[in-house]
Design a protein with these regions (language model features):
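Ser/Thr-rich, Proline-interspersed low-complexity disordered segments
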Residues: 1-21
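A eukaryote-biased signal for short, well-structured alpha-helical docking elements
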Residues: 16-32, 123-164, 267
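Low-complexity, acidic Ser/Thr/Pro/Gly-rich terminal tails and inter-domain linkers that flank the onset
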Residues: 24-51, 151-182
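Short, solvent-exposed loop/turn segments enriched in Ser/Thr/Gly
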Residues: 51-58, 182-189
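Short, hydrophobic/aromatic beta-strand segments
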Residues: 67-74, 198-206
Length: 276
């Protein structure tokens, strides 16, 4: 389970959610300590929320070793939904970097998230020259708006036209809608739930459109107990090459596997047909 980090403060944090102004530091005078050991120290120095651009987490990473290290976030979720901020920093031996993790307002709103009440992530620190050597791999949960584990809620999705393709004790996979208005591509918007205590990988195999094999090269990882929204795109050039002017059916084999154990059996391996 994720660790709740330590806080260092000169002013008491509020118990109630912070209502963001155009831009403000949600931590006030608080510094969140994620890790502090002989090798590394990582602190969240402040969290700024801008109503137009999104949330920015200012992070300080200190490398106390004599070799270059790579700091990164993995398996990131915001309010229960997977979100990849694409953050990583390489820090030379004995040096410190001040960096920023950005959470985009538009991307979060597409998932139904209007307030970033909870963020869970795995902090990885590895040797830059030897990626097999891990100095740190630990999960953390922070609550930027002052809520806690008992008060924040996962935003629920309302998609009346959605087609539920798979729903069992382990996974849920839903095609919410498809957009064929843009002649340059055909995009399917999908939603997934991981109901297990393992990290899972969702992918499509043996995909055909109107009976013609076209591979969208799609795969998404979903952390244990989390949800995800994603887009699956077929490009106009591929459709045109197969003489497809309008998509009438998409057939695919949905594969759900253990993200951390590639030799494990599939949790799901089933073929479905979607009719837009």
């Amino acid at each position: 389970s994720a660790t709740t980090p330590t806080t260092e403060m000169t002013g008491a944090p509020t118990d109630a959610p912070t209502q963001p102004t155009e831009s403000q530091n949600l931590l006030d005078d608080t510094i969140i300590e994620l890790v502090n050991n002989d090798d590394v120290a990582v602190h969240i120095m402040n969290i700024e929320n801008n109503e137009h651009t999104g949330m920015q987490l200012r992070i300080q990473c200190e490398n106390r070793t004599d070799r270059a290290l790579m700091f990164s976030w993995d398996m990131v979720s915001v309010c229960g939904y997977m979100y990849d901020p694409m953050w990583a920093e390489e820090v030379a031996g004995g040096k410190t970097v001040n960096s920023t993790v950005y959470l985009d307002t538009y991307a979060l709103e597409q998932m139904g998230i209007t307030s970033v009440d909870e963020i869970t992530f795995t902090l990885n620190v590895i040797d830059s020259e030897n990626w097999m050597e891990t100095l740190l791999k630990e999960s953390f949960t922070i609550y930027p708006t002052g809520l806690d584990a008992s008060t924040w809620q996962v935003p629920q999705r309302e998609t009346p036209d959605a087609q539920v393709m798979a729903d069992d004790e382990n996974v849920r996979f839903v095609i919410e809608w498809a957009d064929g208005e843009d002649t340059s591509k055909f995009t399917m918007y999908v939603y997934m739930e991981n109901k297990t205590d393992r990290n899972l990988m969702y992918s499509w195999d043996m995909v055909s459109v109107n009976g013609y094999m076209i591979d969208p090269f799609w795969a998404v990882s979903v952390a244990a107990g989390k949800r995800a929204c994603s887009e699956i795109t077929f490009y106009g050039s591929d459709l045109e090459a197969n003489g497809i002017e309008e998509v009438s059916d998409v057939e695919f084999t949905l594969l759900v596997s253990d993200y951390d154990d590639w030799e494990a059996d599939y949790l799901l391996e089933e073929t479905y047909t979607y009719n837009p």
